[in-house]
Each structure stands twice: as structure tokens, then as C-alpha cells.
A protein has these predicted regions:
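Gly/Ser/Thr-rich phosphate-binding loop
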Residues: 268, 293-297, 309-371, 384
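AMP-binding/adenylate-forming catalytic core of the ANL superfamily
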Residues: 120, 137-139, 296, 407, ...
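Conserved pre-ATP/AMP-binding loop-to-beta segment of ANL
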Residues: 180-200, 206-207, 237-247
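ANL superfamily adenylate-forming
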Residues: 20-21, 145-192, 207, 219, ...
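Conserved AMP-binding/adenylation subdomain of ANL enzymes
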Residues: 219-247, 255-294, 309
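Conserved AMP-binding/adenylate-forming core of the ANL superfamily
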Residues: 30-34, 50-84, 90-96, 100-104, ...
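Structural core segment of the AMP-binding/adenylate-forming
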Residues: 1-14, 108-176, 500-502
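Conserved AMP-binding A3 loop
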Residues: 62-64, 196-224
């Protein structure tokens, strides 16, 4: 770690500096300056006026047009629908500019935005909708059929986007009156301690849990990428904020918290987001060239796909200046490959974050990342790191232990689940379940303690897939685990024990699973066999993983 980088961090966090922090009554750190709510954060973007903010396949918006549209929709929520602060607004859409209008309209109306995975099945969506009970659904035409039965039973309002027809009892966004460019937000009090978002993350019980972040937490999450960008600029001899505003390619789906980090960093400086509805490397190359994209960010799978496509087509990615990965651990070879082909022209970045931290809280970039490609970087100023052993006591520097985090951007808990909240937090510290080390203030993730599989940036919880397998009539027992995969990082594997007399093929089991869980969760390696367990009855996933790799290599 260079003295320049450490000096830059001190400059940015000194008393009176833009990212100075203080300790709150709960013991955690918070930013002294900056927004206290997402309403304060988004209202500042009015100053960017006619600069282009959102570019989609069918529509685009300047900052002025976006904010006016969000204000108009927020007033419809409060004045037309009678929604009140604290009511939930659920979004089930692929990436499009109107997704952002819906999200920020919810914030301006004091509602709690609940972004839902657009890839979920009917059963998965209905479970979560039953849990959070939204009063309004904001859906695209493709997903209306998935939620329509639920919203009829619940009596929830529905607004459809990019949809030809009109849902019975609902409204179509395209039919709303033209937006008055002078639209103002509704007169609603939004406080720092009010809930702002619920992002659902699956737990070891196999059921999704709603991670609830307050406005203060999300405002902190918005500061983290600003700090890391400023520190990176100073560390490389540049003044923060110099040059043109970024043009960023948004490959993360908006329902993932990884998208928040990319969104906040772009919005805070008046940059442009070029949206992708679904990932395709060749389409990405075309968008980068057409819109002169400067910043790429995505999960390692998409990053590798983009590099492959660029090499295959001879595209030199001439406009790119920044190349970031998140959502899953990037293979060290990725940054080595980027440097070998593009030198220092494109700055690499990566980091670490969770649903429970409202996005990225650690980051590393530039030469530090090139020299330490396995690192996850340093924490943002309002984030504290602790590495503990099995006794929950801190371990010596450099020794592995469980990573605990505390700070402004952490969630307040899980939606209506006190037991899960109590299990995940201790004295204000969130227990990540990840094994990590810290040296010189820099964190490296060693392994995962929790039984999860990171498949191409998607988090697959073994217990959730096992629960779906156990629901199948032919299955008596099941164990799910991850095995290495060259492109995806990991793929999902499962071993099942069939009920006596059951006559079913692995293909039939796969088809049955596809009706219960999202496609990325369905095991690609499925076999029948014994399931080894220890004396306590816990599955020996390491044994299963070795068996699967042996069969694949043999």
C-alpha cells in the first residue's frame, strides 16, 4: 500500500473534509456531511438539468425529465392512490429507464421500495409478496401474468410498463398524462430513520428474507463509491471530479444491490447510465461504441464475456477508462488479462459488498489491485471491519477468521423476522459468514462459511434448492453444493436419494425444479447417490464436491 494512497485517505476523512465521520449513539460510524435520506440525494440531481441520465432501448431521460417524471408518479401514489409513508411499492421489471422512475417516485412519496428478482417464478414471487404486502405493484408486460393472481387476491394497485394491454383494475404508465416539467414532489416528511428499501436475500432456511435499509443507511451507501472514486483519483495524482461525467454501462439488474453502487456513483456526478435489459457481449460492445461508454461494471462472468468478445472481434474498447467487477469474487487472472491487453489505459476496480451492507463497502483499484489481484480492498470511512475466530474474539492480523462489519450502510434487520436479525447481528456488528484476512487495513476474502454457490454473480443458497428438491414426490433426500466452473466461477450440483420404487429421470427432476425455482438455481449437475453426513447429521459437502470433480475429470 503506497504512502500516497494512505495520505489521500487521510485528506478525504479529516475533520471538515468531504468524507469525515463521527461515531453515533449505537457505536457505529456515520458520515458527518452528505445526504441523510435518499430524497435529499436525488433532489440534488436537479442541478444536472439537461444532461442525459438514462438511456434505454425504447426511451431516454435527462436528469430534469427523470426527476419531473418521478415527482409526478410520486404524487399519483399519494394523491391518487392514497398511499402513505411506510407502505410498500414492489417492482418486478427488467432494466429500463422507468424502473428508476418507479424506484425514486417511491422514495419521494415516503414509500418503501421493494425491488424483486425479475427471474423468479410465480411461487417465489408470491411468497415474497405475501411477506411484504405491497400496496402497489410496478411491473413490465412480461411479468404481469406472474403477479396478477396475487394482486387480485390482495387488492393491490398495479401499474404496467412497456405493456400493450391494460390490466383489469390497473393502469398503463404509457397512458398517464404528459409530465409537467415543473412537477414537484408531494409534501411528505421523510426522515433518516424511516425505511427506504427492502431487498430480498435468501437465507439458510431456504426462504427469502427481506433486508430492510433505512434512508440513512442508503444515504451512506451512496457516499461509499464517491469516497472510493475520490481516493483512487488522489492516489493516482488526479484531482477528484476532473474531466467529463462518466458514461456507464449498467449490466447489473436493478434488483441486485450491486446495481446500487454503480447507480449512486454515476448519479452523484451527473453521469449517464446506458441500460441493458439482458446480457449479451456483442450487444455490449455495440453500446459501448455507440454511446462512447467510459465505465463498465458487471459480475466477473460478464466481464470475462466482454473481454472474450473484444478479443474475438478486435475491438480495442477505445472509450473505456474504468473496468469494475462486483457481485462475486473476480478471478485474479481477470485483472492480469486486462492489464496485459490494455496496459494502464483502463483502470481496474473490484470490491466487496452484500445485500445486508446495501452494496459495496470495500474497494480496490488501479496499481494496488493489479499488484494484489486477490484482494477486496479497504473499507469506506463509515465502515468498520473485524475478523473474529470461533469464540467471536478478534484474531491476530493476517490470520483468517469470520468477517464482521459495522457502519452506516448496514441494514437495520430482516423484515418481520426478529430471530433471523438476532442471529445475524451481535452488538451492532453484522456476521457475514465469509472467511477473510486483514493486512495493513486491506481485506482479502479467503472462503465462504455459509453454504452458498456464486454462479455467474447470482447467489444460490443450497438450502433453498434442497427445499425445492425435497418438495418433489420422487425425492427422499437431497444435498446441494457448488463445483468450480471456468466461466461462471461455480455451477450448482446436487445429489439426490430417490424414494423406493420411484421411477424418474434426472431430466424430469430438472423440469419439475424449473417450475419451483429460478433457472440459475437449477442444478446443472444432478445425480443419484448416497449423501455423506457427519455424526451431527450435517452434510459433508466437501466430500460431495470432491466426488463430483473426480467424476467430471475421470
Amino acid at each position: 500500500v503506497s504512502h500516497v494512497e494512505d495520505r489521500a485517505a487521510r485528506m478525504l476523512t479529516a475533520p471538515g473534509a468531504p468524507f469525515a465521520v463521527a461515531r453515533g449513539e449505537d457505536g457505529g460510524l456515520f458520515y458527518v456531511d452528505g445526504p441523510r435520506t435518499l430524497v435529499e440525494f436525488v433532489e440534488v440531481t436537479w442541478g444536472f438539468g439537461d444532461q442525459v441520465f438514462l438511456v434505454g432501448e425504447r426511451s431516454s431521460y435527462s436528469y430534469r425529465e427523470f426527476l419531473a417524471a418521478a415527482c409526478a408518479l410520486a404524487r399519483r401514489f399519494t394523491e391518487g392512490y392514497g398511499l402513505r409513508p411506510g407502505d410498500r411499492a414492489a417492482m418486478v421489471m427488467r432494466n429500463c429507464p422507468e424502473w428508476q422512475i418507479a424506484f425514486w417516485a417511491a422514495q419521494l412519496a415516503g414509500l418503501v421500495a421493494v425491488p424483486l428478482n425479475a427471474r423468479w417464478t410465480v411461487a417465489e414471487l408470491e411468497y415474497v409478496l405475501d411477506d411484504c404486502q405491497p400496496r402497489v405493484l410496478l411491473v413490465d408486460g412480461e411479468r404481469l401474468a406472474l403477479v396478477d393472481d396475487w394482486r387480485r387476491r390482495a387488492g393491490a394497485r398495479v401499474i404496467t410498463f412497456e405493456h400493450e394491454g391494460v390490466a383489469e383494475g390497473g393502469e398503463r404508465y404509457e397512458d398517464f398524462p404528459a409530465v409537467d416539467p415543473r412537477s414537484a414532489p408531494p409534501q411528505v416528511e421523510v426522515r433518516a430513520e424511516d425505511d427506504a428499501t427492502i431487498f430480498y436475500t435468501s437465507g439458510t432456511t431456504g426462504r427469502p428474507k427481506g433486508a430492510v435499509a433505512t434512508h440513512l443507511a442508503q444515504a451512506g451507501a451512496a457516499q461509499h463509491p464517491r469516497y472510493h472514486a475520490a481516493a483512487a483519483a488522489l492516489g493516482s495524482g488526479r484531482f477528484p471530479g476532473q474531466g467529463a461525467a462518466p458514461v456507464a454501462l449498467m449490466t447489473y439488474p436493478f434488483f441486485h444491490v450491486a446495481a446500487l453502487t454503480a447507480l449512486y456513483s454515476t448519479m452523484s456526478v451527473g453521469g449517464t447510465l446506458v441500460l441493458m435489459r439482458r446480457w449479451d457481449a456483442d450487444d455490449a460492445l455495440a453500446l459501448i461504441a455507440r454511446h462512447r461508454v467510459t465505465h463498465f461494471s458487471g459480475v466477473p462472468t460478464t466481464a470475462l464475456d466482454l473481454l472474450d468478445a473484444a478479443e474475438r472481434t478486435g475491438d480495442d474498447l477505445a472509450t473505456l477508462t474504468h473496468f469494475s467487477t462486483g457481485g462475486a469474487a473476480a478471478p485474479p487472472a481477470l485483472v492480469t488479462r486486462l492489464a496485459a491487453r490494455y496496459g494502464h489505459r483502463i483502470e481496474p476496480r473490484t470490491g466487496y459488498g452484500l445485500t445486508e451492507t446495501s452494496g459495496g463497502v470495500l474497494a480496490v483499484s488501479g496499481d494496488e489491485y493489479r499488484n494484489e489481484p486477490a484482494g477486496a480492498g479497504a473499507p469506506a470511512p463509515a465502515v468498520e471491519v473485524r475478523i473474529v475466530g470461533v469464540d467471536a474474539e478478534p484474531v491476530p492480523e493476517g490470520e483468517p477468521g469470520e468477517l464482521w462489519l459495522r457502519g452506516q450502510s448496514l441494514i437495520r434487520g430482516y423484515w418481520r423476522d426478529e430471530a433471523a436479525t438476532a442471529a445475524a447481528f451481535e452488538g451492532g456488528w453484522f456476521k457475514t459468514g465469509d472467511l477473510a484476512t486483514v493486512r495493513d487495513g486491506r481485506v482479502a476474502i479467503v472462503d465462504r462459511i455459509k453454504d452458498i454457490v456464486l454462479r455467474g454473480g447470482e447467489t444460490v443458497y443450497c438450502a433453498q434448492v434442497e427445499a425445492a428438491l425435497h418438495d418433489l414426490p420422487a425425492v427422499a433426500d437431497a444435498a446441494v453444493f457448488g463445483v468450480p466452473h471456468d466461466r461462471l466461477g461455480e455451477e450448482v450440483a446436487a445429489v439426490v436419494r430417490l424414494r423406493p420404487g420411484a421411477a424418474v429421470t434426472m431430466g424430469e427432476l430438472t423440469e419439475q425444479l424449473a417450475d419451483r425455482i429460478a433457472a440459475y438455481q437449477v442444478p446443472t449437475l444432478l445425480s443419484v447417490g448416497d449423501i455423506p453426513r457427519n455424526a451431527a447429521g450435517k452434510t459433508l459437502r466437501g466430500v460431495l464436491r470432491s466426488r463430483a470433480q473426480g467424476l467430471r475429470n475421470g
